[in-house]
Amino acid sequence: MPFVQIHLRSGRSEVWLQKLSRTIHQSMIEEINVPEDDYFQVIRQYEKSEFFYDPFYLQVERTDELIYIHFTLKQSRTTEQKKALYRSIASRIHSELGVRKEDVFIMLAGNQDEDWSFGNGRAQMIE
């Protein structure tokens, strides 16, 4: 059950944002076996004065088109699955939305089953 937070500069259309969201989700389905209906994402847009990055950290040249994609998900994926996910997302966003691969910044934060409540104040994954 991944929860995805997407952060980017403001100015994109609703249609573009929906395509970005679905593009990321499709990579999750294919690379880390996320069910199609396991779809929980938020997109936050920021003004220039609220969005910061180093344009050359680790010799990757970034622009104002930078997209931060932050996953919170169970610690059940292998290193190879994670690497495949990174490649798939960057490639898809580039080919479908025209964003440079260098501007796709992905972070994964793992947790356990007991760290999720899907509503009703219950921990459904451990009940």
Swiss-Prot record:
Supply the InterPro entries for this chain: Tauto_MSAD, Tautomerase/MIF_sf
Q: Name one GO molecular function term.
A: isomerase activity
Give the enzyme class: isomerase
Q: Which SUPFAM superfamilies match?
A: Tautomerase/MIF
Under Pfam families, the record lists: Tautomerase_2
Residues forming the catalytic site: P2 (proton acceptor)
List keywords of the entry alphabetically: Isomerase
Protein EC:
5.3.2.-
Give the record's family classification.
Answer: Belongs to the 4-oxalocrotonate tautomerase family.
Protein name per its UniProtKB record: Probable tautomerase YusQ
What is the gene called?
yusQ
